[in-house]
Amino acid sequence: MVRTEDACGIIKCALQNDIKVYLDGGWGVDALLGRESRIHNDIDLFVELKHYRDYIHVIKQHGFREMTTDYTTDGHTIWKDDKQRIIDLHCFEFTNDGIVYEGDIFPSETFSGIGKVGDITVSCIDPLSQVMVHLGYEHDENDMHDVMLLCETFQIAVPDEYKEK
């Protein structure tokens, strides 16, 4: 489980080493909201390719070990420590065409969100993009919770697949 104090510590590991991180997933949503709205089993972080290996070195020094899963790739790795805190780490690159992640190109504005975790101001996926990345798959109760809070807070139309049937 990754609570606010854990998320702050993980983020500070990057910032203290001049590595900028961008939040996604549940913590990305909660950063936009400025509060912890639910329990998180992990923290999703995006790190630029030029800092990816450096950040891995840093988190290893803080006791995180890589876990191999069926969805890990060279640019998407999972890290866990003895306190059962999990970092879902993604590597991306800024290009003239936008943000390149796993061969896909996203608009440069995707990381234009600004939020807060504890007392740390963080960059994250903007609210509309957060809602959009929650589409097209079978969502769970956390997805429902996150999307509904984003739509309510930022006056975004609730997507059809999230409307009560």
Residue ranges and their predicted role:
Residues 15, 60, 116:
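Anion (oxyanion) recognition and catalysis
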Residues 101-165:
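Catalytic cores of NTP-dependent nucleotidyl/adenyl transfer enzymes across multiple folds
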Residues 1-23, 148, 155-165:
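Helical scaffold of the NTase/Pol beta-like nucleotidyltransferase catalytic core
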Residues 64-98:
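Conserved catalytic core of two-metal-ion nucleotidyltransferases
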Residues 11-43, 48-49, 54, 126:
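Active-site nucleotide-donor binding segment shared across nucleotidyl transfer reactions
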Residues 54-61:
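Short, well-structured hydrophobic secondary-structure segments
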Residues 61-71, 114, 158-160:
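Short secondary-structure junctions
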Residues 28-29, 94-95, 129-131:
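Short, solvent-exposed loop/turn segments at secondary-structure junctions
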